[in-house]
Amino acid sequence: MNNIRNFAIIAHIDHGKSTLADRLIEECNGLEAREMINQILDSMDIERERGITIKAQTVKLNYTANDGNQYCLNLMDTPGHVDFSYEVSRSLAACEGSLLVVDSSQGVEAQTLANVYKAIDNNHEIIVVLNKVDLPAADPEKVKLQVEEVIGIDASESVLISAKTGLGIKDVLEAIVAKLPAPQGDVNAPLQAILVDSWYDTYLGVVILVRVKNGVLKKGMRIVMMSNNATYQIDNIGIFTPKKVMTGELSAGEVGFITASMKEVADCKVGDTITEEKRPCSEALPGFKEVHPVVFCSIFPHKTDDFKYLREALEKLHLNDASFTFEAETSNALGYGFRCGFLGMLHLEVIQERLEREFDLDLTATAPSVIYRVTTRSGEVLNIHNPSDMPDPTKIEIVEEPWITATIMVPDQYLGDILSLCEERRGEQEDLSYIGNTTTALLRYKLPLSEVVFDFYDRLKSISKGYASLDWEISSYLVSQIDKLSFLINGEPVDALACIVHKSRAEKRGREICARLKDLIPRQQYKIAIQAAVGGKIIARETINPYRKDVTAKLYGGDVTRRMKLLEKQKKGKKRLHSIGNVNIPQNAFIQALKISD
């Protein structure tokens, strides 16, 4: 056990985490040269294209150090995005040390900060690695100072590398062996293992990634999940090198995978403790919590026939990702679809993109919504994320909405614009400080989650030319003035456009969507009224004027009463059409109307 090192790589998006993992695998001959592809641990196409890591991955490497000893290095590649922060915290709980990778041309960013604090909470030994030192804009000395001032850890012995060219990779491996502690654990104690991640394999069923803290996992053993007391028999045990290699057992300190004929990923919750049925451990490992969706939206297929394919696609994705939820719903305007819950906006985008790309579906997504807590006059408390479930305003006592604490790091030339953005989004400033002697400001703001889930991140990036970074966590629910905004077309409500908004935003949003619908809905033979309403009150209106058909064109001369008679007949016909005619709203109009304006 003294020769085992378990470590994670912490980095902000794009600072070179997956590339460093590639170089470490190459250096330790984990794969032959012909099998190497860039970002080997990012197994989904979408992970490679967006340059993000979504699922936690692991790899076991054998390394012969300069002292002549053979070491077993277990590397955990963790997600870097705020939506997947719980996965990060569980991966970190399975390790004793971390490599903090910082881009030496960009410096420390907000998500790096959040993940480093998680590592410190897990008592990690941290090695600072400055990447991209071969870039002309690299300034390692300045970044070392920044790491010391912002994070408060010693960066004097930072390892300077370029993951792209392979410079300094050997130094990283030596630092891991020399500075990171070996795992603690007792092979003879009752089994205690942490569930780090799980995914679905077509042949093996659910594959579980585990780190054994105490005891030994053996093939054929009956195990218990401590969160729900479900029992299973282990079929296979192995490690990733990054290829699957069956080993038959894992003992204290080791990281590997097990399969146990599980049918669904939902049965194995990340962070759960696994123990033996015959000789269980006395208590579960700390830190486990259920992950709940934060952002909701409805997804509808363009073609009604695709509904069953959408259900199958969602079920397949759910096998690998139990953190998103879905349930069937119907809309008068868009037909059959699903109400889905996600961990955040990136999670929503990734799932939607995978549905469209991997399953070849054309989809419409409604405006994202968060969970509001509604207390009715009868004292009942409801959690509501779908506008159609909102009770009548006369029955509502109070509505509370989720607020977050956001940490924003931004160069000071963009500070004014970022402060304006936060104020515009109903933010309350908690703290503003400068990082050491740098020109980077550290902002702490309280913001309503509903204002952040739309396009806050995109606006933040565009205002700051990409230099600002954001990290957030939900802090509390606060009483707020929330309204349900409905849209009526010729007096008929259109459920797909309804949304839940803050009172101060209702009129502006109502006017925007009415104006957009006016441009998108084709003209008819009669007048069309587009209205936005809150409660029973109309707050915005647009009118689409009808075509004018010249019914008197065929007249030549003759009595004026003939002309009046034809116009009167046309008027009656239009009135009848208006009372029985349904306005045909093209699918495209919904998609365009639901796009959030700047």
UniProtKB/Swiss-Prot annotation:
Gene Ontology molecular function terms on file: GTP binding; GTPase activity; guanosine tetraphosphate binding; ribosome binding; translation elongation factor activity
Domain of life (superkingdom): Bacteria
Gene Ontology CC entries for this record: plasma membrane
All copies of domain tr-type G, residue ranges: 2-184
Compartments it resides in: Cell membrane
Keywords, sorted A to Z: Cell membrane, GTP-binding, Hydrolase, Membrane, Nucleotide-binding, Protein biosynthesis
Biological processes, Gene Ontology terms: positive regulation of translation
Name of the protein this chain belongs to: Elongation factor 4
